[in-house]
Amino acid sequence: MKFGIVVNTNRPRAIAAGKELISWMRKEQIDFVLDANSAENLKESPSVEMENMHEQADFFVSLGGDGTLLGVSHFSNTKPIIGINLGRLGFLAEFCEHEMYDVIKRVLQNNFMLENRTQLEVSVSGKGQVRNFTGLNDVVIEKGTYPGVPVISVSIDNNLVSEYRADGVIIATSTGSTGYSLSAGGPIIIPKSKVFVVTPVCPHMLTVRPMVICDDKEIEVRVETPGDRFVLNCDGMLIQNISPSHQIRVRKAKNTVNLIANERRNYYNVLRQKFHWGKEQES
């Protein structure tokens, strides 16, 4: 059994944890490989390019925050991910640093629970090209550097829902509902719910609200305003610039992202702790 280790090299704490983990794995004779960037920054080996890591690793270990785990999910190719939270919120990265060794031991003993998270599959066609990619949290179509308020049309199963006059539109999974969508006024959705949420960003339309839909629907998005400064990003990573000539289709992906679950965690406790629900504000 081999573990693929990915470290957020922008966090000194993650680098330190990565070095400790590698030292422990060598001592325990546990097979591992690092992605090339982590290996270079930690001055460790062996390494492999990130896009090829799934060919060597049976499990991924993500050392960082939720953003690090999101990046890993794009390359895991259904291989299970152990998320070690060394960031801030830690919705996706379920394990604390002090739980790192215990969860790896349990994986080695085949004593673990998997949580399958739905992904978005996104198809962008235009200018004679078609690009396909996936996202665990969300896909966002936004104004980019366009100075005005663009019009973005959204259709569901070929039925027009609205032409939003807004800074952008977020399409989020239940997993991604506590990310950008929440900041834009969207609802919190329990991760295993079989739904997507369509959330407009700063709509110049007083009656517009986020919409929750079944995840068996196909969503089509188009920018109706002329220009080429609009952007499409996925899980916080820029994918490409878009224009009215592009057609964007979003649906449920065939493959899930598979996370090693922390059986000691309760999602409602996590919400209460992370968002400080029920706590009085100190003066």
From Swiss-Prot:
Provide a Gene Ontology MF annotation, just one: NAD binding
Q: Which cofactor does it need?
A: a divalent metal cation
The residues that hold NAD(+) are 66-67, 137-138, 165, 167, 178-183
Q: Which UniProt keywords apply?
A: ATP-binding, Cytoplasm, Kinase, NAD, NADP, Nucleotide-binding, Transferase
What does the entry list under GO cellular component?
cytoplasm
Q: Which domain of life is it from?
A: Bacteria
**Intracellular or extracellular location(s):** Cytoplasm
Instruction: List this protein's GO terms for biological process.
Output: NAD metabolic process; NADP biosynthetic process
The entry assigns this protein to a family as follows: Belongs to the NAD kinase family.
- Please explain the role this protein plays, according to its UniProt record: Involved in the regulation of the intracellular balance of NAD and NADP, and is a key enzyme in the biosynthesis of NADP. Catalyzes specifically the phosphorylation on 2'-hydroxyl of the adenosine moiety of NAD to yield NADP.
Please give the name of this protein: NAD kinase
Read off the lineage from the record. Bacteria, Pseudomonadati, Chlorobiota, Chlorobiia, Chlorobiales
Gene giving rise to this polypeptide: nadK
